[in-house]
Amino acid sequence: MRFADITGQEDLKRHLARSVDAGRVSHAQLFSGAAGYGTLALAVAYVQYLCCRHRRDGDSCGECPDCRQIAALAHPDLHLVFPVNKQGKKSGEAVRSDEFLPQFRALFAERGGW
């Protein structure tokens, strides 16, 4: 996912790219928005820009190994957190967000990615 693939949000995309280019990236980012706003896509595009080996013109290249791994949601530095529902589990059995990642990746691939 590249910034160019996201419709609108030009000021925000430019701000995110400039912060990376200036070396001013905070230790954490929280992306939040209403359904249909493109929040997940924007967050993934930002991570891809951070990790890209060949950034150019305010966007990731989309072709280097890091870009390809992030586009497939398989990069080791990309961590997704999912809300969990503890109902249905045995008491004392911990529910972990990362248990849902294989299902999310399969659903993502099944629906053709972005």
Q: What is each residue range found by the language model?
A:
Residues 2-114:
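Clamp-loader machinery-focused feature within the broader ASCE/P-loop NTPase space
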